[in-house]
């Protein structure tokens, strides 16, 4: 979800159905990229500073942005670009929805 040019929320949910549970390489790739981004946001202090929140529930990931920060936007754009690159090869297994606030 975006407000003008800034990312305000990212949701990653569901299962790619590329392979059986536990052996799905598409899910593993998406999870690895998303986990790396979440760890980066935490290490850079954005969670502690309450500029964003990460909600992990039932295998789903949601990142909510409360206060805009240019560095955080670069990190989040990295996630979006990585997910978009997955869709180039696995478009039948990954759906990206873009919303404007």
Label for each model-derived stretch:
Residues 1-25, 35, 39-101:
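N-terminal intrinsically disordered, cationic/polar leader segments
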Residues 32:
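Phosphate-binding glycine-rich loops of NTP-binding sites
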């Amino acid at each position: 979800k975006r407000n003008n040019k800034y990312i305000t929320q990212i949701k990653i949910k569901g299962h790619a159905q590329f392979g059986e549970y536990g052996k799905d390489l598409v899910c593993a790739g998406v999870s690895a990229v998303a986990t790396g981004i979440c760890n980066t946001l935490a290490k850079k202090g954005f969670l502690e500073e309450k500029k964003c929140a990460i909600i992990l529930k039932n295998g789903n990931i949601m990142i909510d942005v409360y206060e805009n920060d240019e560095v955080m936007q670069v990190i989040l754009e990295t996630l979006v670009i990585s997910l978009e690159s997955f869709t180039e090869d696995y478009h039948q297994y990954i759906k990206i929805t873009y919303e404007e606030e």
